[in-house]
C-alpha cells in the first residue's frame, strides 16, 4: 500500500553534541534520531540514540503542548547496547513512564503537568502535533529531535455539506472513485472529523456526519430520525467520487450502537465497524431530555432498554435488541474489557452470539482488549492517560476505564486490523490502486 501520509523523503531532525567519552583520545558524537520524523497520527516512528558508551545508562525525555495549551511529558531510562545505541522499538526501559519495548512508548505514556487536566486534547483543526525529544546524559541534555504527527494526510480534500445534512466529506488525494465510510460519533455529539480524516488519509471517502449538538441540530441525543442517516447514505451513493456498492458505516459508543442499528436497516451498508458498542438501543441522552427514546423510524419511537446505570431489565433488552443478523455485510466490533462507561465487552459478545445463533452469512469478529477502557482501539497514537472526563453534552464526569498502557496497546493492535477489515469487506481503498 502506498503511504500518502508520509512525506516523500525521510527527514531526520538531529541536534548532535560532540563530547569526549570512553577514554582519552576517543570522541563520540551523541545523536537522537527519529525515523521518519513526520508521520500520520496512526503511524509509529522509531526513536534511536547513538554514540553512547556500551552499557551506558541514559534517559530520553519527551514533551508536547496539546490543543488545549496543556503541557505533557514523559521520560524513560535505558541501557545502551554493545554498540552504544538505544532503539525504543527494541529495548524496554529500565525505569520511566512505561515499562515495555515500544517504538512510541514515550508518546503514549505522557502525562499532563497540570494535575487538573483530564485528558489529551488534539491540535485544533486537524493540525500538526509537534513532540520534542531530548537525550539526557549524566543529567545534561546532549541531543534533541522533533517528531511531527499529522492529523490528516497532505492533499486530503474537505467538502462541507450544505442543506439538511450536517457534515464534512473528506476525499483522499489519489485518483477516484473510492470506497466510502459513513462516520458517526457518540454521546459527545458534534462532528467526528478526526476519525474521518484518518480514513481519508488511508484512501477512503469518509463522511463525518453530525446528528446532534451541532449547528441547528438537536441539542441532545433524543428522538433522532433514522431516515436522516438514510439521506446521508443516498447522498454518498450519488457522489461520483464514491463507489455506491462499497459503503461502510463506523461509529463509537452510542455511535457504535447506531452503526449496528443502521447496518441492520439499510442494505446499502456493506460493512459495519462498531467501537465499544451496545447490542441494544438505549434511551435518550444526555441531560434533561424531552422524550425518553433516542431513535425514531417512520415517525415512531424505537423500543429502548433501561439506562445502563440503573441495572438490566431483560424484557426491555429483548424488545430493544438490535437485529444485527439483518446486516448485508461483515461486522467488526471492538471493546475494552475494563470499560468504565458501560459493559462494552459483554454487549459486543452479545452481538457475536446473536450472529452465531442466526447463522449469519457474512464474516464477523470481536476485538476485545484487556486493560483497555471506553477508548479501546482509538485510531491514533497519542497520550492515553486520562482522569475523569467531562461529557460535553451532559456536563457530567465519566470514568472511561482502562489504563494508559492498555488503551495504547489496543490502539496499536486495532489500527491495522480495522483497515484490513475494511480492505477485505469493501475492496482496495484509493491508496492501494
Please provide the spans of the model-predicted regions.
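N-terminal cap/lid segment of alpha/beta-hydrolase-fold proteins
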Residues: 33-40, 45-57, 69-74, 79-81, ...
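Cap/lid segment of the alpha/beta-hydrolase catalytic domain
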Residues: 164-165, 176-238, 245, 283-287, ...
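Short, aromatic- and glycine-rich surface loops/edge beta-strands on solvent-exposed regions
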Residues: 100, 105, 114-138
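Short beta-strand-to-loop junctions in surface cap/lid or active-site-entrance loops
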Residues: 166-177, 185-187, 320-324, 424
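Primarily recognizes the serine-hydrolase "nucleophile elbow" in alpha/beta-hydrolase
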Residues: 189-194, 230-317, 342-346
Amino acid at each position: 500500500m502506498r503511504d500518502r501520509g508520509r512525506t516523500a523523503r525521510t527527514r531526520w531532525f538531529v541536534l548532535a553534541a560532540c563530547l569526549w567519552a570512553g577514554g582519552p583520545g576517543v570522541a563520540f558524537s551523541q545523536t537522537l534520531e527519529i525515523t521518519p520524523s513526520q508521520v500520520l497520527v496512526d503511524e509509529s516512528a522509531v526513536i534511536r540514540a547513538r554514540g553512547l558508551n556500551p552499557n551506558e545508562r541514559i534517559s530520553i525525555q519527551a514533551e508536547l503542548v496539546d490543543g488545549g495549551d496543556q503541557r505533557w511529558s514523559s521520560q524513560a531510562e535505558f541501557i545502551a547496547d554493545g554498540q552504544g545505541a538505544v532503539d525504543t522499538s527494541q529495548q524496554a526501559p529500565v525505569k520511566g513512564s512505561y515499562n515495555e519495548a515500544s517504538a512510541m512508548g514515550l508518546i503514549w505514556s505522557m502525562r499532563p503537568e497540570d494535575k487538573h487536566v483530564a485528558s489529551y486534547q488534539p491540535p485544533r483543526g486537524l493540525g500538526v502535533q509537534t513532540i520534542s525529544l531530548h537525550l539526557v546524559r549524566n543529567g545534561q541534555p546532549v541531543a534533541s529531535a522533533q517528531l511531527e504527527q499529522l492529523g490528516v494526510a497532505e492533499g486530503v480534500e474537505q467538502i462541507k455539506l450544505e442543506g439538511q445534512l450536517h457534515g464534512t466529506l473528506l476525499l483522499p488525494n489519489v485518483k477516484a472513485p473510492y470506497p466510502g465510510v459513513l462516520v458517526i460519533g457518540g454521546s459527545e455529539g458534534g462532528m467526528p472529523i478526526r476519525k474521518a480524516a484518518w480514513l481519508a488519509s488511508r484512501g477512503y471517502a469518509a463522511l463525518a456526519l453530525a446528528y446532534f449538538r451541532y449547528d441547528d441540530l438537536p441539542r441532545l441525543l433524543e428522538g433522532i430520525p433514522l431516515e436522516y442517516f438514510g439521506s446521508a447514505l443516498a447522498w454518498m451513493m450519488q457522489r461520483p467520487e464514491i463507489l455506491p456498492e462499497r459503503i461502510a458505516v463506523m461509529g463509537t459508543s452510542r455511535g457504535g450502537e447506531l452503526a449496528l442499528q443502521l447496518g441492520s436497516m439499510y442494505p446499502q451498508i456493506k460493512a459495519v465497524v462498531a467501537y465499544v458498542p451496545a447490542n441494544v438501543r438505549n434511551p435518550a441522552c444526555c441531560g434533561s431530555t424531552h422524550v425518553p427514546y433516542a431513535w425514531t423510524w417512520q415517525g415512531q419511537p424505537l423500543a429502548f432498554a433501561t439506562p445502563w446505570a440503573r441495572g438490566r431489565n431483560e424484557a426491555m433488552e429483548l424488545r430493544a435488541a438490535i437485529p444485527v443478523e439483518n446486516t448485508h455485510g461483515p461486522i467488526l466490533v471492538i471493546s475494552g474489557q475494563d470499560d468504565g462507561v458501560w459493559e462494552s465487552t459483554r454487549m459486543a459478545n452479545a452481538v457475536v452470539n446473536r450472529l452465531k445463533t442466526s447463522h449469519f452469512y457474512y464474516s464477523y469478529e470481536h476485538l476485545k482488549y484487556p486493560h483497555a477502557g471506553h477508548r479501546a482501539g482509538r485510531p491514533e497514537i497519542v497520550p492515553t492517560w486520562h482522569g475523569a472526563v467531562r461529557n460535553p453534552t451532559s456536563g457530567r464526569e465519566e470514568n472511561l476505564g482502562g489504563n494508559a498502557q492498555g488503551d495504547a496497546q489496543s490502539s496499536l493492535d486495532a489500527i491495522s486490523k480495522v483497515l484490513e477489515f475494511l480492505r477485505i469487506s469493501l475492496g482496495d481503498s484509493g491508496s492501494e490502486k
